Amino acid sequence: AMTQTELLKMIGSGAVRDLDLTGRELKNIDFKGCRVENVTFDECTLTECNFDGCGMERVSFRKAVLRNCRFRRAKIAWSDFRYCEIERATFEEAEIRFCDLYRAMLTGIVIMRRARIGETSLYYAYFGEGVNIRRENIAGGRLLQQDLDAYRRFLIEWNTSGTGVRRNDRAEQSAWSPD
């Protein structure tokens, strides 16, 4: 497994790629301005981590807990936030595209000012009262599930560009995977 020192060295190089950090406890890590690609934070607890200005692709935060994390002006694509708990965060001016927030829970103050969310699934996501998502945050003013053809394309694309075939809690392939 990668040590904290090795991780910080990788961050210092400006690119964090092809890493599996499943189940790790990460505190006060500053990824600011990094390229973060093909990284798995599944079931991690991230506290006070800074992803401001990051370019993030194929990053999985599945079942992770994010507390007081920052994603200001981050560009996040093809990333997995399913069952993720996001508690107090800022996504101010972030661009979120082709992501899956199925059953994600956002609680506390989560700042979405001028964030753009497009081609993203918010199916069964829970937004607490401190989360202010406005229509102008949603690209084209529509969510993916409201446009079934687009949603189906997203599910098919997700299997090639995203973080892989969706599975449900019982590790079976989800019924709402595309055929």
Predicted regions and their residues:
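Tandem repeat scaffolds
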Residues: M2-P178
